[in-house]
């Protein structure tokens, strides 16, 4: 008979065709292609190459066909020679690491990004200005050369620092390498050998046992009770059985293939390697992350926006005054020098270093709070987050199944789900509990890994699946040494749990002093266990299982199931000694023992409980205007129960289904607007258009996506971003990588996360805790606030530095301040105070504000610019000019005499220039007085910048509400300002190249009234903002 050639089953492994898990009603999980997403991505990203197809038919082949295909022997394995040839041909069995940016490129990016460009332009303009001056005067001052060199040096030093910070985070990341197994047990040359897993090749025969990770894609040849955890690949949380049986066309669903890097939870398996390294399924998926581009961070956009503003203002003012200078009959070359001077005066030279240090300080603070920041700019992004799409397992929950409730003696008891299980309050004296605890202990294949004698019970590593681990630890805490109990009740026969039977059964020799007999114990799906029972134990005695007791059972079962908990039923049967003597041989294939008319003992339910810190964290998110969306592969009932327990769904919120149930009407009849919450399944999401998803995201504040695959996160993230939201996404699986890269900020789990997820993320949670994200949000908001304050502080003095050039050109005064003097303000006295603002504590309303809108709430907005430049900036300029005019008046030049004096003042051959009192001044004397004027203007700005620094501690609250001495680093900054000012004025007075002279002490106090005025003025501004929220004053004076 002609045999039809097996059809190759194509599995698309990308964010374009999704793998969606749906329940067909027969208990089997199905995966369906999400074509909508494919079309959207094709239209949107034009990335046909994003689709990668894996053609796999090995699961359909017989053992003989496999041997022929791979040239191997199932019993003897490959020869070492052949294995070496294949290794040379295919390369090592490891995933190619993501393409790394060369270190030199990373370094150069730090040199030319954001503020750096502005400083480089300033440096080149300085050199051009010197060139112009030198062309007409060979003895031209080298000030502009020095200024250009210093600006270049600032960029280089700051770039080195930023590069070092990011390299440090990268090095920490490289230490995470938990996903790939290191060793593999292989049969070669008829011998079992342990070799590095990287040396595996196709055709190798490998053996894997419970607790090991699968070292490659393998086709199962034989297995004993093997179950694997595929969650990092498919998002499937339930353990999946593995056998040599071909059960499904789809290789992702068939039982006879195990996938690279998934975990064997229990049992043993022997298999043939069919794919290695990048050719494995997980290798294909891991490569998808490179198909989704990194998005520019909000803070990078803000800095770019700020650079454009500063450059625009500088160039506009420069050109304006170039035109004025030319119209006032200045030489064109002189006018160009003025133009360059004005542009350079507008460049905030110290801000680049300040921003870099501020981001680094915050990153260090966050590392102490278990948030590892890979990209410094990601810190602020977290602060502007408006939607958090969070995993359930391990992030919102403790990532450990825990016994939550017990039902026996017709009562539901609440178990302690805290970290240590120490406070169990149910009745442990009941004889029914004694029987139930024995079943829980014996009908369990989980075991503690050896060598953990001193490790607390709840932290011990276990070989076994999550449910059995929960039962083992529960028994160990309450009953003591479980392994000792099992030794005393030796297991003589066992039927492992499987999806067909839906029960697990074991038979044990009893440690009965009155005579040996056998006890059969069973656990499994409650309805299946009840079917096998004719009696029920109540208060230690067996009673007939009648309709009344069955109804009580069903009520309890439905109540526990409705809580989203996984419920198991337990029963037992003492086998009669006369029918089953000590020498009896049990045969599990022949089933030569009874499996009906058993005694039902009780129910036990388990749940992965919420972390204790999460409800408070979710409440903080609500106050902060952040929408928290749960995205999980779990059952909708479980997801909804956890969402309610942590506050993602409020206690009084109802879904459409809840309303339908309450009113006893069909779901279609419910007005969707009456529902405040929504639980959307992956199956529903698969059939939704983008518009329908957008409608759900826009209309519901409380949303849970359940039964979704990790790939569907990409659709959800894109949907959120279409709402103009800044989206943070958590992920741990390989399949989460595209969503992590697409999100504004990707957050990987440090403990449970795969390497692919960590590589794609911007931030890694070292404790996998949702509360750490909220801490990060607060830190991110704080950094945005503090950057605003720093920029406002830095911009204020720009007007005071710019006005002297404008007055110099228009009014013709002797130059009030030189470019080198300005540099000492920007890179000397102001650097430490600017950095000190990074240490400022949060204002009281920081987590009660709505998230900032990325297109409207800018880092540098109109109120900030207007207030800094035209309010405080002009006050500073007036105060500094007051000191300048005071010095000149004291020396004999009254203000009216200085007007239009510039041309005569600067003539080298004029040595008899008369002041207001007729005294004659030589060129050298005038130059020394000019340097004294520089120093006076410098001191005037310095004194007022102290007041400016203090007022920048808050934007809304009074300084006295915030605490004047709460941030001690501010006072370090003020002290540094004064010390640097004193050193420049007195210690280096003889160094005329710096253009500073020794200043009389009284000149330091001339600007103090202006400094006090600045403080009082700002306190009044903040008072009116607090008194009249939403008013014109609030909108225009709150920056």
Swiss-Prot record:
Can you provide one Gene Ontology molecular function annotated for this UniProt record?
P-type sodium:potassium-exchanging transporter activity
State the reactions this protein catalyses: K(+)(out) + ATP + H2O + H(+)(in) = K(+)(in) + ADP + phosphate + 2 H(+)(out); K(+)(out) + Na(+)(in) + ATP + H2O = K(+)(in) + Na(+)(out) + ADP + phosphate + H(+)
Assigned EC number: 7.2.2.19, 7.2.2.13
Expression is induced as follows: Up-regulated by inflammatory cytokine IL13.
Q: Keywords in UniProt for this one?
A: ATP-binding, Cell membrane, Hydrogen ion transport, Ion transport, Magnesium, Membrane, Metal-binding, Nucleotide-binding, Phosphoprotein, Potassium, Potassium transport, Sodium, Sodium transport, Translocase, Transmembrane, Transmembrane helix, Transport
Q: Which positions in this protein are listed as binding Mg(2+)?
A: 732, 736
Q: How does it sit in the membrane?
A: Multi-pass membrane protein
**Top enzyme category:** translocase
Could you give a single Gene Ontology term from the biological process aspect? intracellular sodium ion homeostasis
Q: Which domain of life is it from?
A: Eukaryota
Active site per database record = 391 (4-aspartylphosphate intermediate)
Task: According to the UniProt record, list the residues that bear Phosphoserine.
Answer: 958
Cellular location of this protein? Apical cell membrane
Q: What does this protein do?
A: The catalytic subunit of a H(+)/K(+) ATPase and/or Na(+)/K(+) ATPase pump which transports K(+) ions in exchange for Na(+) and/or H(+) ions across the apical membrane of epithelial cells. Uses ATP as an energy source to pump K(+) ions into the cell while transporting Na(+) and/or H(+) ions to the extracellular compartment. Involved in the maintenance of electrolyte homeostasis through K(+) ion absorption in kidney and colon. In the airway epithelium, may play a primary role in mucus acidification regulating its viscosity and clearance.
Entry similarity comment: Belongs to the cation transport ATPase (P-type) (TC 3.A.3) family. Type IIC subfamily.
Q: What is this protein called?
A: Potassium-transporting ATPase alpha chain 2
Annotated source species: Homo sapiens (Human)
